[in-house]
């Protein structure tokens, strides 16, 4: 496994610990809410939650912001644009767009674990326009064509 060093900046509203892996094989690191006052997300509502951190990703890396499964299954709280993408050239505060799909209001307190961040390497491509594509068994079948 390759370890890549990434610069992280604690902002004025930061509190708690830096994102870290919970176990040896965790893919994601928990992001912590850095809101000054509690934020209530009403049922069906979306809120932007600050984390108090900014990062400088190396070229060809992105950060993916994903839901925490416990918040989703227990409270209906998930990341609205999942996965959210943080590009390598973004230097502002990481914020998480949460939506409450549950039936009850939910309060985000400062220091609460609100999402996971996965750091991933990616490749860029160059389009090669073509009048035909190679045939596959699946062909153009989609949206349930391989079974439910």
From Swiss-Prot:
EC numbers for this chain: 3.6.1.23
HAMAP family documented for this protein: dUTPase_bact
Stated role: This enzyme is involved in nucleotide metabolism: it produces dUMP, the immediate precursor of thymidine nucleotides and it decreases the intracellular concentration of dUTP so that uracil cannot be incorporated into DNA.
Catalytic reaction equation(s): dUTP + H2O = dUMP + diphosphate + H(+)
UniProt xrefs under NCBIfam families: dut, PRK00601.1
PANTHER family in UniProt: DEOXYURIDINE 5'-TRIPHOSPHATE NUCLEOTIDOHYDROLASE (PTHR11241:SF0)
Gene that produces this protein: dut
This protein's record includes keyword Magnesium: yes
Gene3D superfamilies, per the entry: 2.70.40.10
Top-level taxon in the UniProt lineage: Bacteria
Originating species: Rickettsia felis (strain ATCC VR-1525 / URRWXCal2) (Rickettsia azadi)
Official protein name in the record: Deoxyuridine 5'-triphosphate nucleotidohydrolase
SUPFAM superfamilies named in the record: dUTPase-like
Keywords of the record: Hydrolase, Magnesium, Metal-binding, Nucleotide metabolism
Cofactors required: Mg(2+)
Similarity remark: Belongs to the dUTPase family.
Gene Ontology BP term (one): dUTP catabolic process
GO molecular function per UniProt: dUTP diphosphatase activity; magnesium ion binding
Pathway the protein acts in: Pyrimidine metabolism; dUMP biosynthesis; dUMP from dCTP (dUTP route): step 2/2
């Amino acid at each position: 496994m390759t370890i890549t060093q990434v610069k992280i900046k604690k902002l004025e509203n930061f509190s708690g610990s830096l994102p870290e892996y919970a176990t040896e094989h965790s893919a994601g690191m928990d992001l912590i809410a850095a809101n000054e006052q509690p934020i209530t997300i009403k049922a069906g509502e979306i809120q932007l939650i600050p984390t108090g951190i900014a990062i400088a990703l190396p070229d060809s890396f992105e950060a993916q912001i994903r839901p925490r499964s416990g918040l989703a299954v227990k409270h209906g709280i998930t990341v609205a644009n999942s996965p959210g993408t943080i590009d390598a050239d973004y230097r502002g505060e990481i914020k998480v767009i949460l939506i409450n799909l549950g039936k009850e209001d939910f309060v985000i307190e400062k220091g609460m674990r609100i999402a996971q961040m996965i750091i991933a390497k990616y490749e860029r491509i160059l389009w090669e326009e073509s009048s035909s594509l190679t045939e596959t068994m699946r062909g153009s079948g989609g949206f349930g064509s391989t079974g439910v």
